[in-house]
UniProtKB/Swiss-Prot annotation:
Residues 152-163 are annotated as: C-terminal short (CTS) helix. Keywords: Endoplasmic reticulum, Hydrolase, Membrane, Protease, Signal-anchor, Transmembrane, Transmembrane helix. Residues 31-166 are lumenal. Component of the signal peptidase complex (SPC) composed of a catalytic subunit SEC11 and three accessory subunits SPC1, SPC2 and SPC3. The complex induces a local thinning of the ER membrane which is used to measure the length of the signal peptide (SP) h-region of protein substrates. This ensures the selectivity of the complex towards h-regions shorter than 18-20 amino acids. SPC associates with the translocon complex. InterPro entries: LexA/Signal_pep-like_sf, Pept_S26A_signal_pept_1_Ser-AS, Peptidase_S24_S26A/B/C, Peptidase_S26, Peptidase_S26B. Catalytic component of the signal peptidase complex (SPC) which catalyzes the cleavage of N-terminal signal sequences from nascent proteins as they are translocated into the lumen of the endoplasmic reticulum. Specifically cleaves N-terminal signal peptides that contain a hydrophobic alpha-helix (h-region) shorter than 18-20 amino acids. It is a single-pass type II membrane protein. The active site is at S44, H83, D108. This is Signal peptidase complex catalytic subunit SEC11. PROSITE patterns: SPASE_I_1, SPASE_I_3. Belongs to the peptidase S26B family.
Length: 166
């Protein structure tokens, strides 16, 4: 393989990664969310959403209603949580939300940060669920939970880039 072919392969790979990054950033700006697409990681929202479903978020709603499904993050925890709004309180300055998973027996008070009784709509919410694709996100779960699958996928990607002729 000559140097020109190697440069072409590198540029093709760089093009794929930069296109994916640009698509992600475009979706982030349109949805007004740092994470416009999330994967359901647990069964707490069954039967509405199953583990492995991909959710599409929108964060341009000014007020959430009881029954809306929202994704939120808690300070100090890196994994976003998908749950339904159980109660809401608002005044002219902010909206406070209490959430609960459809498949959970109790509300999310124990999941919130210490001394936090409600979610702040502007600070804690990643977005409101507007659509989903069932089971497509299961690949992400397999990659994060199974080290052999992760290294196997990386190996296949590496081999395919080495042996491709384009």
């Amino acid at each position: 393989m000559n140097i020109r072919q190697q440069i072409t392969q590198f540029l093709s790979l760089a093009y794929v990664f930069s296109s994916a990054f640009m698509l992600w950033k475009t979706l982030s700006v349109i949805a007004n969310s740092h994470s416009p697409i999330v994967v359901v990681l647990s069964g707490s929202m069954e039967p509405a959403f199953q583990r492995g479903d991909i959710l599409f978020l929108w964060n341009r709603d000014h007020q959430q209603k009881v029954g809306d499904i929202v994704v939120y993050e808690i300070d100090g925890k890196s994994i976003p949580i998908v749950h339904r709004v159980l109660r809401e309180h608002h005044n002219s300055e902010k909206q406070l939300l209490l959430t609960k998973g459809d498949n959970n027996a109790v509300d999310d008070l124990s999941l919130y940060a210490k001394k936090q009784q409600y979610l702040n709509q502007k600070q804690d919410l990643v977005g409101t669920v507007k659509g989903y694709l069932p089971f497509i996100g299961y690949v992400t779960i397999l990659i994060s939970e199974n080290v052999y699958f992760k290294y196997g996928m990386l190996g296949l990607l590496g081999l395919s880039s080495l042996f491709s002729n384009e």
